[in-house]
Amino acid sequence: MPESYTRDPKRVEKTLREKGVVVVMGRDHAKTPQDVINTVRGIYEAGLIAEVTFRIHEGVLKEDMSELRKRRAEAQRSHPGNPMLLGVGSVINPRELEAAIEMGFDMIVGPDSGMGGCRERIDFVKIVRAAKCFGVPGAFSPSEFAYFLEREDGLEPDGIKIFNASVYGPSGMGALLAPYQRERHNGKMVMPTGGVNLKTAAGFQEQISKRGFCPIL
């Protein structure tokens, strides 16, 4: 990463809370390296946050990040109140996690609660925290959600992704979160992924907010 830019999880958190929407990019959005750069730029200019994924060829991501890091540093200098955050998702093993950190992403998102190859599920949180990245591991079941939410070791992740949210739908998402309504969890970020679209977004937002959590769609 250029020395002119320093990763800051608090900057990511503040921006996520302000914007509330992350636009996920898959392989279909990246026919060429320039496609990724143009799409990320367009998402940023629209006032949202872009998340590329490791479904895109890693070589393409590396090439793109060389340019995107420069644009991010420039945006930070010229518009410090509107940072260009670079997120990456579909990170499924320690090698991809280390690659994401090395490439300079601000936010790293995993689709499941147990990253293949890690000794313990919580290793994801330890690694991203040490790298000063904003980390969001995935969960699906109540036990997986509680594993990250209810910790006494101070290793709660920055947010928790619920995948595949289409299985729950908005009302089911509310039912999943209801038992965990506690004052200490107020404002904790929950990111439903899968089945979130123009028809369902408002429902997910309402159900998550009603349970005291902060919805990031």
Where are the language model's segments positioned?
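Generic hydrophobic/aromatic pocket-lining and core-packing "Φ" positions
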Residues: 36-40, 65, 97, 121-125, ...
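Catalytic beta/alpha-barrel core
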Residues: 24-28, 48-58, 83-93, 105-119, ...
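Active-site-adjacent loop and "lid" segments of alpha/beta metabolic enzymes
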Residues: 109, 192, 205-206
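Alpha-helix-loop-beta-strand connector modules within alpha/beta enzyme cores
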Residues: 58-90, 120-141, 171-197
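Conserved N-terminal beta1-alpha1 strand-loop-helix module at the mouth
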Residues: 1-103, 206
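Active-site pocket-lining/capping segments in soluble small-molecule metabolic enzymes
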Residues: 3-11, 191-193, 197-201, 212-217
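Catalytic cores of alpha/beta
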Residues: 93-103, 142-154, 196-215
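Anionic-ligand binding region
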Residues: 143-153, 160, 170-179
